Swiss-Prot record:
Binding site for Ca(2+) 3: D1142, I1159, I1211, N1213
Glycosylation sites: N58, N105, N757, N1189, N1257, N1301, S1317
Matching SUPFAM superfamilies: Concanavalin A-like lectins/glucanases
Species for this entry: Homo sapiens (Human)
CDD domains: EGF_CA, LamG
Name of the protein this chain belongs to: Neurexin-3
Subunit details: The laminin G-like domain 2 binds to NXPH1. Specific isoforms bind to alpha-dystroglycan. The cytoplasmic C-terminal region binds to CASK. Specific isoforms bind neuroligins NLGN1, NLGN2 and NLGN3. Interacts with CLSTN3.
Intrachain disulfide bonds: C202-C213, C207-C222, C224-C234, C404-C440, C610-C639, C647-C658, C652-C667, C669-C679, C1018-C1046, C1053-C1064, C1058-C1073, C1075-C1085
Gene transcribed to yield this protein: NRXN3
Amino acid sequence: MSSTLHSVFFTLKVSILLGSLLGLCLGLEFMGLPNQWARYLRWDASTRSDLSFQFKTNVSTGLLLYLDDGGVCDFLCLSLVDGRVQLRFSMDCAETAVLSNKQVNDSSWHFLMVSRDRLRTVLMLDGEGQSGELQPQRPYMDVVSDLFLGGVPTDIRPSALTLDGVQAMPGFKGLILDLKYGNSEPRLLGSRGVQMDAEGPCGERPCENGGICFLLDGHPTCDCSTTGYGGKLCSEDVSQDPGLSHLMMSEQAREENVATFRGSEYLCYDLSQNPIQSSSDEITLSFKTWQRNGLILHTGKSADYVNLALKDGAVSLVINLGSGAFEAIVEPVNGKFNDNAWHDVKVTRNLRQVTISVDGILTTTGYTQEDYTMLGSDDFFYVGGSPSTADLPGSPVSNNFMGCLKEVVYKNNDIRLELSRLARIADTKMKIYGEVVFKCENVATLDPINFETPEAYISLPKWNTKRMGSISFDFRTTEPNGLILFTHGKPQERKDARSQKNTKVDFFAVELLDGNLYLLLDMGSGTIKVKATQKKANDGEWYHVDIQRDGRSGTISVNSRRTPFTASGESEILDLEGDMYLGGLPENRAGLILPTELWTAMLNYGYVGCIRDLFIDGRSKNIRQLAEMQNAAGVKSSCSRMSAKQCDSYPCKNNAVCKDGWNRFICDCTGTGYWGRTCEREASILSYDGSMYMKIIMPMVMHTEAEDVSFRFMSQRAYGLLVATTSRDSADTLRLELDGGRVKLMVNLDCIRINCNSSKGPETLYAGQKLNDNEWHTVRVVRRGKSLKLTVDDDVAEGTMVGDHTRLEFHNIETGIMTEKRYISVVPSSFIGHLQSLMFNGLLYIDLCKNGDIDYCELKARFGLRNIIADPVTFKTKSSYLSLATLQAYTSMHLFFQFKTTSPDGFILFNSGDGNDFIAVELVKGYIHYVFDLGNGPNVIKGNSDRPLNDNQWHNVVITRDNSNTHSLKVDTKVVTQVINGAKNLDLKGDLYMAGLAQGMYSNLPKLVASRDGFQGCLASVDLNGRLPDLINDALHRSGQIERGCEGPSTTCQEDSCANQGVCMQQWEGFTCDCSMTSYSGNQCNDPGATYIFGKSGGLILYTWPANDRPSTRSDRLAVGFSTTVKDGILVRIDSAPGLGDFLQLHIEQGKIGVVFNIGTVDISIKEERTPVNDGKYHVVRFTRNGGNATLQVDNWPVNEHYPTGRQLTIFNTQAQIAIGGKDKGRLFQGQLSGLYYDGLKVLNMAAENNPNIKINGSVRLVGEVPSILGTTQTTSMPPEMSTTVMETTTTMATTTTRKNRSTASIQPTSDDLVSSAECSSDDEDFVECEPSTTGGELVIPLLVEDPLATPPIATRAPSITLPPTFRPLLTIIETTKDSLSMTSEAGLPCLSDQGSDGCDDDGLVISGYGSGETFDSNLPPTDDEDFYTTFSLVTDKSLSTSIFEGGYKAHAPKWESKDFRPNKVSETSRTTTTSLSPELIRFTASSSSGMVPKLPAGKMNNRDLKPQPDIVLLPLPTAYELDSTKLKSPLITSPMFRNVPTANPTEPGIRRVPGASEVIRESSSTTGMVVGIVAAAALCILILLYAMYKYRNRDEGSYQVDETRNYISNSAQSNGTLMKEKQQSSKSGHKKQKNKDREYYV
């Protein structure tokens, strides 16, 4: 079949082979034998491709070539018919044939090419073409088979061949050479009856002087480029060739007509006055460049043009005379023409014959189409580029030339245009655009850039394209996915099918997905997605991409393979705004609207690989320079491929899978429980108890068509929600849940709601078996449009969604519990278990939430691998039970519960049924029995635990029955399985009884059921075949004592009574746990403390003490839990009042935790040097200070101790504020802080309760709910808030001596000392004169204050607390004056007592001298390393009351009675109140075993027969009870079984003591009641004061003055209910005058 060729695109490629093989031109010789064949690798002729070879024969029939689709419809066959070549082919069962006009059986060489272009196939024979065209349903040919030359093997089944009789066709006889697919040589797979060493025309070696022979149009041609000779056989000297005379021109003349182009410049000669009309033309020029692609010369338009360009380093010529394009490409033997060396090009045309030669040697000759011979052009002659190169007709490239051009000359029969010279002399018809330099300068190469990480990207300026535009670039990578280019336009509100506003934008993008290149375009009417490659392009080779658009239509070319596209709608304008992103997207995408169809963006796939030669609208972009200017992270200005595989060094840790990427290794951490570049960082774990969840609230509604989801989970339940996406506006969801021990994936795209035509409801997949085994399991979900893949461990399930709708909408990602339930008919069961490494589309959400990297995380689950006890219920007696609705377990069953008991026997679960069916679970002699009857008689399965389970520990029980009637009982880790034959269904009726039965039911139980009593103990986490009942609220009937929670029967301190190093403290009828230094809270210190997450932008929590209530301390305790990944940051800092400079700071430096503090001398620091703590794990740090001594401990690591040398001050003066987060100091902390405790203040709890003294700013977010501060009764373990603290208030004496001369041998107390600083602007330890606002004596009162909300100190076992020997007869010595006794009346303070204002006259100040267990020796000198101060232990059974009565004090003298010294009794305490500002002081009587009181050093007790214990403190009565005035009780002091909390010793040079545990917290509370005998007490008080005045009136050691504005204790109410006591203000007056009224007071 012969037809006229219109617009046939013929490409003739000259490829020079290397070495001796080329010189010999070896080929295949076919003998024409039966069953002869040569088999080559499949030729992809599906859409666009070329195949060529040369042959010689003398026969008229024979099969040349054959391929097909495996016996269906499509085939292509070349054969000889009557001496001519016939092309016969079929597509989609539509067949045609083409027959050449030329005879070929003439024993001459012939060149044959088959060119495929979708519906058209062209047969080219010796430059003449015949085409055949089909109009099938599909525009491509399906090729399955390999390619056969010379014949088809007879062993192939005829049914597998599409063309009937092809095997019977006679074989080809002759020679075939140089078979190529495009430019590449295919691989020979095998042959039969073929001689492989046939010589071609080059076998005679016709080329002289080392020239290389190759075939051109069937004739041998010589390549003389490397010989220095010319001519047809390389036999002529080049200097004698007149055709090359221009090479002999002087260098000066050559340089005169040369110009440099840099990509934006070009020359334009106007032909409108003198149009070209010629039948023969000649173009000559020389070029020099580093550039691979660029326009050299162009003239003409429409279908009449000449285009000369550099394409991928080869010279390309395209000529169209009106009947179709002729293209010739000339390539060098070695390398490319873009080698920055001069190359000469000569193009000649004579009528239809076209010849192009490069460097006078490489020559290609061809013919234009049809009979058109005239070239006409009245347009422009472009040199070096054009305004829009991509839009020029026939242009194979889209960018301008970069390099040097010289002596560009066009001539025909009529004119000669020396274009370079005309530009140089500025001819009027020649326009010069850009800065063209008329000499050859070096043009900087467009260096490639390498994106080394997926996060790397650079920003390009806005692409100003409206109706047309072009982009070209080269890329190279080995990774399959990555976003290469993206830009979009202005958001526009449009209504979608849901009749809702939807933000749409015009956008343009190029992405690499699964190794294929895609173009995405939306011009306002919908997105098109064009696949531009037929094979994967991530093989590490360079690929050239050229995109050209004109209105709605355009093409994308990859390595010259073009794919056309047409945008949707009618608009021809692409409206873009903002930057264009190359290589990826920025981390902050707030201003970006990402299209749903752009999967790489939604999946967070950044491009990793190289990009070079980026041209936009023909103009180059120096992307290397842009990357340097933007300081782009992860972008390198070079491109080289590492030869060694990166995974050979096994870089991935923790059994992660290593994959080789582009010059990097990729560690797949899925399933390892770790994350990071090498999977070195442990991923955070969330624990769920059925009431907990984590909800990620997306900042905006998300729409995706592709998702990657992975996580690990561990659970003992067979049911429960794992992860789900939910929408507020639709039923769209991607949900993963446990369903009967399997993972169920359900995807619902709500197709019905948006009026889709085809929908079958949610798509469901299942994978995995028996996953409720309390082991880690890994889940992965991959969705790409309609394709679904679910993988659980190694079990894979795949599916395809039905319908055209692929978009998933969601507002939230939820775990544990589904809170968005509006569009859900059946709510999934809550999850009980652990979740880790949740990654959704590249984001690790659990760790992002924990570290504060995201602000839209709602967290109720708890971090850490915790022992989960969900919704526990206590059955306090064996007669207690409850009933629930019938257990639904007809075909299968999954039961789970936890129990804890000390009883060996008891009913746990029972449900009777129809007939004999029943199920029972019981505890028999400490072992679980599972008893059941399905109708075949009762069976029992007994648990095989290693020991009885009534050990007061929690145990897990799982009972399952599957469809095959296999029953299994798992107790903790032990499993027993039994297969039951016969009936398979369990038909239950009536109530399900839990923990027991009604009394009358025990006598009617089936046999094999042993229990005759109920269960006494705790049940938790009860799961009844997927249903999580609330045992209390869902009960149909309850009987006996059933309580929520599980306190357990233990009322004494055990080793495990308090978790997380909490301190167990024995109480009267129970125990409490001191959680102060643990960062935890709750009854047993196993609940998280108040937790705040500090974001990356920094935050600050600032607590400020009231101005009149600023403490000063000699010792401090600080504890906090944290997790972070920062290397530097301040966690907590406490500062003194302005001007003092004292501070204490907890910080992380170089990843290690440390504390630095200054209390008046130099900075003292202590640091944990061994291990960094910025590993993202949860750590608890504990710090104690006693004077200059300090301890620091992290978790259970060894304690760091620091004892500074030399003289050290000890008091931390006038503490003013606590700053948490480091933002105020510029050292930001990012991460989680939990349970902060400092000297009695739980600052984070106070912040969560909106304490008015706390301010919060910056990125700070509270996690979950604030732990309850309400206590329980004393008979059970109590929370740490219901505790008592000991406060000892001392003031320092000002003396006339200097500090250097003072003695350092003073006695130090071991308790924390809170020192009233009286707001002095100087250090309390520096004897600088400080004048208070008033004068007078100052009281020094050791106080024991009952604090209802502070944490108790440690209780220890010790002998009786003894009294100081010097104060047995009468312990109270008070000196005062009449003036000082009138303080109360002068203050005029209001009354806020419990009784109201009427009871104020009878309120009093209750004073107790019972301190922290220290003794006082009167023989010791009254000296201290800073001040003279004394503390006395004093117990009174009367109270010293002060009230407004006749302008003075009423005082009750204390007295001692022998009944006060009884063991296990507490002395009577009277409660009175002076005003609302008075503290309640409760004193206790120490028990004594002897009447003698030995002398003991301060802070020590006589414990010779005891093991070392922490410091002795006294436990007060709880404030929740009224004191019985008729009974005397002594404090209970026990020895708890716990690890000591490290505590710094007092500052004492040269002595190191075992750290104790003590704290000082100052609180106040109101007192009630009236003191009897006011008058007698006042009289006694006056006598004592007079005696004291007489004895001490002549002392010259300085005096204390009473500041009447501050000597009352204020009750400043706090938001959390505690009362803060105002400090007493002191004055240091080392040089003050002595006045007679100055007195000293010791109480």
